[in-house]
């Protein structure tokens, strides 16, 4: 396993935000795997991340819901807030066990103010629209976010799971700092259009699920040890008919990792890091051991030939099954109506 060393800093986007080259995705600290966690242990993990140089912390008001922001609010007391870049999200809601989406101005403002209270901060560094509300022109949503920037409640604006045309329309209203998307060895469709668009416009790229929701960390057998409440059990790629095919990719990555004296998780994460200095992956974990391992991925060096080998491993035919549940909005269905259609 590659050892953890210093975490370098990168410029995320072209609007002035500087972050650690790797962030911490905090979703799993509060939700979605069905296990019970101890708050003091989670706060200790967050502090360990910050003290190790991982300063971009990523949360959302839907995680918990709300409890993840409250957890970070506790963790960032006593001077810790000044050491981090704090990112949260709005726009994805859970009501009566059903997902909903809102991007209207009144909701944007109310969601921001509620997040500020839960986090115990006066300003959010990076505020994303978590999923696009396809009933509201993106210009309207970004227009309200622009007001929040002007009022000092948020510093930078981002989108998550947005298509290239929506990104362009949003960026024309107020410059975007980052777009968050799923990017890993087994989720590469964003390379066709979204990544080039972000780079053309000077928008930073934040890669979530860079380890394939744990697939590259533990291999295909980890599905057997998942708690019954773990949402990943229901995802298409983890169904047995697809897993039998997908495990071949893991085996290839594992074999290459052994040659490089690192773990498959570190190799998969290093592949994301090597995509460019405009990319910040945000792997999540609730274990300090895994956090240290993820930081160690920054020390894994890949040659042009090794990157080409990994690219070949992760070709589209190497993976079977959709990456997310069919009921969740992704960039593939994130177009919004024209601004001319909006009546407030």
UniProtKB/Swiss-Prot annotation:
Enzyme Commission designation: 1.1.1.-
Binding residues annotated for substrate, in chain numbering: 130
Oxidoreductase keyword on record: yes
Record-listed NADP(+) binding positions: 209-219
UniProt KW keywords: NADP, Oxidoreductase
Protein family according to the UniProt entry: Belongs to the aldo/keto reductase family.
Name of the protein in question: Probable aldo-keto reductase 1
Species annotation: Arabidopsis thaliana (Mouse-ear cress)
């Amino acid at each position: 396993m590659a050892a953890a060393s210093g975490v370098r800093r990168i410029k995320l986007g072209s609007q002035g935000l500087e972050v650690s080259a790797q962030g911490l995705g905090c979703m799993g600290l509060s939700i979605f795997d069905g296990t019970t966690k101890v708050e003091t242990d989670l706060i200790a993990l967050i502090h360990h991340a910050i003290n190790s140089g991982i300063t971009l912390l990523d949360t959302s008001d839907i995680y918990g819901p709300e409890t993840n922001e409250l957890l970070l609010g506790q963790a960032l007391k006593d001077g810790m807030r000044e050491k981090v870049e704090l990112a949260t999200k709005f726009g994805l809601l859970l009501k009566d066990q059903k997902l909903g989406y809102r991007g209207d101005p009144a909701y944007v403002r109310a969601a921001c103010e509620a997040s500020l209270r839960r986090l115990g901060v006066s300003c959010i560094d990076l505020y994303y629209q978590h999923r696009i509300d396809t009933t509201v022109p993106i210009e309207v949503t970004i227009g309200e976010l622009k007001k929040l920037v002007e009022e000092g409640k948020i510093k930078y604006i981002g989108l998550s799971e947005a298509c290239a045309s929506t990104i362009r329309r949003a960026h024309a209203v107020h410059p975007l700092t980052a777009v968050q998307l799923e990017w890993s060895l087994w989720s590469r469709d964003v390379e066709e259009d979204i990544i080039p668009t972000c780079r053309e416009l000077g928008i930073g790229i934040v890669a979530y699920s860079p380890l394939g929701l744990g697939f590259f960390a533990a291999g295909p057998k980890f599905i057997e040890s998942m708690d019954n409440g773990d949402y990943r059990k229901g995802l298409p790629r983890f169904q047995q008919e697809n897993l039998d095919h997908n495990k071949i990719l893991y085996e290839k990555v594992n074999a290459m990792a052994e040659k490089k004296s690192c773990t498959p998780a570190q190799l998969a994460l290093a592949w994301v890091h090597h995509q460019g200095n405009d990319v910040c992956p945000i792997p999540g974990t609730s274990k300090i051991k895994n956090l240290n391992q993820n930081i160690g991925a920054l020390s894994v060096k890949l040659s042009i030939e090794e990157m080409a080998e990994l690219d070949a491993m992760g070709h589209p035919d190497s993976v079977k099954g959709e990456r997310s549940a069919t009921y969740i909005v992704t960039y593939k269905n994130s177009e919004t109506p024209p601004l001319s259609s909006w009546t407030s």
